[in-house]
Amino acid sequence: MSSVTFLGTGGGRMVVLNQLRKSGGFWLKLDNVNILQDPGPGSLVMVHQLRLKPRDLDAIMLSHMHIDHSNDVNVVTEAMTGGGFHPRVRLIVPADCMNSDPVVLQYIRPFVGITEIKKGMEITLGEVKIGFPIQTMHPVETYGIIYSFKEGRLGYIPDTEYFPELAGAYRGVDFLIINVVRMKTDKRIRHLNMDEAAKLIGEIHPKRAILTHFGLQVLKADPELQAKNISEKTGVDVMAAHDGMSVNFEKKENHEWF
């Protein structure tokens, strides 16, 4: 059964630096393929606390290089390759994670096969197809992702400011994970706010959406209440993630998710 497990749901400097929520990204198990998405600070600690096994990972994926999404990429790479003695896995990252201001250490690179993300590309891991339909609007090179697997299609909207083309890139997904750092827009900080997230969810209209990557404003406003409000507004099943939460992606015959 495919699933997502949240190794952290915190976003933004105040939440991450003070660990008001954990910040380890999320672990996807899709058709028996295991992928760690955006391993921020404390990711490896949460992996072990939740009794997941780094050696089970098939890939690490970075949406972008910022520290709350990439801090643990090197130590998790060490863990999933047995210190480099079992170099069988893949690291999938934007080019600037390797080049301009690299977050992947040189000595780690021979341990893994490295794929540099480009807009519009598609790759396959086992039976899982992974597409990168859009480059988002963020201060560094950042890509949205769609995972296609047996139970459906999962879209991930990482850090970005709102722009009109965003919703169209995700239309047709069954399931959506969306980073929502703020309640109100600050143009200096290129992140989605809650109203923009609600608009995207309404336009994309997945069967279920999960909010995560909460900044301090969102925590004060109660993420669960915000998810309920968006559900009522859009008719979509919306939930707020919490640290350690797992959700199964199983489709019933009537095509509902639970």
Regions found by a protein language model. Give the residues of each.
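Conserved beta-strand hairpin/beta-sheet module of binuclear metal-dependent hydrolase folds
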Residues: 1-50, 142-158, 175
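Cap/insert and terminal regions of metallo-dependent hydrolase folds
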Residues: 162-245
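Binuclear metal-dependent phosphoesterase catalytic core
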Residues: 240-258
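Active-site neighborhood of phospho(di)ester-bond hydrolases with catalytic His/Asp-centered motifs
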Residues: 36-40, 58-68, 94, 155-160, ...
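Metallo-beta-lactamase
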Residues: 86-142, 149-151, 250, 257
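Metal-dependent catalytic neighborhoods of phosphoester/phosphodiester hydrolases
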Residues: 71-80, 104, 219-228
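Short beta->alpha connector loops
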Residues: 41-42, 96-97, 136-139, 159-163
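Active-site metal-binding motif and surrounding structural segment of the metallo-beta-lactamase
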Residues: 42-92, 174-175
